[in-house]
Amino acid sequence: GPLFAGLFNTVDGYDTHAKVPDYFNAVNKNALDAGKISIIASGWDPGLFSINRLYAEAILPVGNTYTFWGKGISQGHSDAIRRVKGVKDAKQYTIPVENAVEAVKRGDMPDFTTGEMHKRECFVVVEDGADKKRIEHEIKMMPDYFSDYDTEVHFITEEELKKNHSGMPHGGLVIHYGKTGLKKSHNHMIEYKLELDSNPDFTANVLIAFARAAYRLNQEGVSGAKTVVDIAPAYLSTKSADEIRKSII
């Protein structure tokens, strides 16, 4: 990221939330020195979900924001399972906990622990003679991936994995529940939802839209690192400003 930012206008889907500030600073320095623009973390989370969290919190500052991911395949978690000795292939689904979603929509404003919002479901193909009990234990106890979650492990054949789990679906929800009024007696909910047949296809389209914005902004002389919330929506569109005013506003 930082290397290419010093050479070209760039757009990326950097997705490690906790490291975004440091990544931004590294990219920003090189992009500014080169007179280039780099739009970082511009997938759907971080990305589109970031925009919706910001809008919701700006409009309803008294409230709580909740982000649920899934149901969908997590590529990182699937890779982690494949690294377990004896595993031939695997897919892992991240699934929102329905009771948690319902509690948020009721306006309970709950404080969740890590494992209370999502559960993990794993479909695993093992090598001949592999110890399934050991593999299941290693998966469920894996720190940072599964140990904090309700995790189910299903052992299936390679044919079943290819037939039933070959796609790359994903999605999620951003829900903001807020209150207004002198006595905070008026309740409001903002919800943004994605249901994706193909996570890679959708993410690529998001990146293309922000590439359009990067080109336009650089033509105006803008340089340095930007996040998705720094970009005015009109820069993403294929339509002219006049067309936007006629058909969207």
Regions inferred by a protein language model and the residue ranges of each:
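A generic structural signal for well-ordered alpha-helical segments
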Residues: 3-4, 27, 31, 82
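Rossmann-fold NAD(P)-binding glycine/threonine-rich loop
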Residues: 13-38
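Rossmann-like dinucleotide-binding core of oxidoreductases
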Residues: 34-99
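C-terminal substrate-binding/catalytic lobe of Rossmann-fold NAD(P)-dependent oxidoreductases
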Residues: 74-211
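NAD(P)-dependent Rossmann-like dehydrogenase/reductase catalytic/cofactor-binding core
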Residues: 188-249
